[in-house]
Amino acid sequence: MSINHPLSVLLVGAGGFLGTVARYLVALAFSPASPGFPFATFSVNIAGSFLIGFLSELAVSTTIVSPEARLFLVTGFCGGFTTFSSYMFEGATLARDGELFYFSLYLAGSIVGGFVALYTGIIAAKPWS
């Protein structure tokens, strides 16, 4: 199936819907417990980075993740689940509020943690590739 096939749009949209709902549920779960640090966004970005690495490696190296499943899971679900724009906004809010420790921890931790999670996902997929 080509990327401009109508089913491709539906797969990405359905995955994005589910990823967005999952992100919202994570935010609800974390909201009472994280008044100072944006743990929900941090968590979904780290988890999403792992998933993108894991699923992309399987899609490239095996037949376990089909091109259609990759559209649904990686482009759709993970695209809806991860939150770069929220990450930037929450980082700017921490800086504006003078929370320089949390600002630094959040931005650097998200980048380093995201990279480590992505690479870990790739390594975790290797037994199947």
UniProtKB/Swiss-Prot annotation:
GO terms for cellular component: plasma membrane. Its main location: membrane. Fluoride-specific ion channel. Important for reducing fluoride concentration in the cell, thus reducing its toxicity. Na(+) is not transported, but it plays an essential structural role and its presence is essential for fluoride channel function. One of its GO terms (biological process) is cellular detoxification of fluoride. It comes from Chlorobium luteolum (strain DSM 273 / BCRC 81028 / 2530). Na(+) binds at residues 79, 82. The gene is fluC. Belongs to the fluoride channel Fluc/FEX (TC 1.A.43) family. InterPro entries: FluC. The keyword Ion transport applies. It is found in: Cell inner membrane. The keyword Metal-binding applies. The chain crosses the membrane at residues 10-30, 35-55, 71-91, 105-125. One of its GO terms (molecular function) is metal ion binding. This is Fluoride-specific ion channel FluC. It catalyses: fluoride(in) = fluoride(out). It is a multi-pass membrane protein. Keywords: Cell inner membrane, Cell membrane, Ion channel, Ion transport, Membrane, Metal-binding, Sodium, Transmembrane, Transmembrane helix, Transport.
